[in-house]
Amino acid sequence: MSLVAIGINHKTATVDLREKVAFSPDSIHDAMKSLASRTRSGEAVILSTCNRTELYCNDAVATEVIEWLADYHDLNLQDLLACTYQHEDQAAVKHLMRVAAGLDSLVLGEPQILGQVKQAFVKAKEAGTTALTIDRLFQNTFSVAKKVRTETEIGAAAVSVAFAAVSMAKHIFSSLKATKVLLIGAGETIELVAKHLKDNGVASIVVANRTLERAQAMCQAFDATAITLQQIPDFLPKADIVISSTASPLPILGKGMVEKALKTRRHQPMLLVDIAVPRDIEAEVGELDDAFLYTVDDLHSIIEQNMASRKEAAEQAELITEDQSLLFMEWLTSLESVDSIREYRTQSLVIKDELVERALNKLAQGGDSEQVIIELANRLTNRLIHSPTQALTVASRQGDLTTLGQLRAALGLDKH
């Protein structure tokens, strides 16, 4: 029985298979209870995201956990085994710490996974499938993830186009809170840009899209204003920042439109970030004195530099997870030592109580007290030295001098 981590992720399986092993929010409570019943400790946590499904169990057998996963989702066991990774004990601990720190993510160092790990732990607590070991493991993991964030630069540099666009705006404007932003398009990239802007305190966001309904649907989540592409000339003069990402085959913003907007702004600077391919903003806009135009190529060069920086930070983070996983295993081993001592004491007391009861019965039946005491001492001695004697005999026969030396030291034989 071991501490085990079983998983499937974006590196080992296709989207189709990842969808099949995923757990819905409605099913995960009962699923964890079912999984926990397969462990000796009753401890289990299921982490299920779009990129990974992982099972963490204490006092479990890895093969049995995989069999449970196959049975639960009615999947072929061999197909599942081909895409599954297994970690035990320290390797399992380190894997969880790496996952929570973003070291195993599709985007290196992404912070969202830590929240997902925390949510999985909360769900397990609610299901009653955690105890001392899993509780300590996950609490330590959260501390390690925080340590990685504070002691390395793994999360400091932008590695997505959306994040890079917002990061560029932060470098140009001392604060984004007072800026007015015009977003053109309503796809996934623009939605992610809007999220990053909101996270940075931007209060005024206008979303322009060819389909007004799509823009309105997106704006509900960000308290933004939706407009059509035809309304852009009316709103452009108010925009300090313009970020565009559409699928339009022709430019949406021309030099003339931007030039007119800048005159209305009395030549206050405007940052324009064109994420689209082909371009949404005419290249000539960059020739205007108060327009600062950046394209997706400019962002990619920033992302490449930042990815190199993250990889360097990841090397430092790997050392942290290695050290902290070893410390956790030391704690776990000490816990097991305490359990072993308790079991040994309990076993000895059971033997003592059994033999004392037998001796008292003989005395009650009129047995000779001296003979009863001698017999008690002999029986107690024989029972207590039986297991150590067997261990010494096996070590001697096998020529295992290391074990023999350890046994002699434990039994205090070298003191005489």
UniProtKB/Swiss-Prot annotation:
Single Gene Ontology MF annotation: NADP binding
Top EC class, one word: oxidoreductase
Pathway the protein takes part in: Porphyrin-containing compound metabolism; protoporphyrin-IX biosynthesis; 5-aminolevulinate from L-glutamyl-tRNA(Glu): step 1/2
Enzyme Commission number: 1.2.1.70
Matching PROSITE patterns: GLUTR (PS00747)
Signal peptide (UniProt feature, chain positions): none
Miscellaneous comment: During catalysis, the active site Cys acts as a nucleophile attacking the alpha-carbonyl group of tRNA-bound glutamate with the formation of a thioester intermediate between enzyme and glutamate, and the concomitant release of tRNA(Glu). The thioester intermediate is finally reduced by direct hydride transfer from NADPH, to form the product GSA.
Job description of the protein: Catalyzes the NADPH-dependent reduction of glutamyl-tRNA(Glu) to glutamate 1-semialdehyde (GSA).
PANTHER family found in the cross-reference section: GLUTAMYL-TRNA REDUCTASE
Listed name of the protein: Glutamyl-tRNA reductase
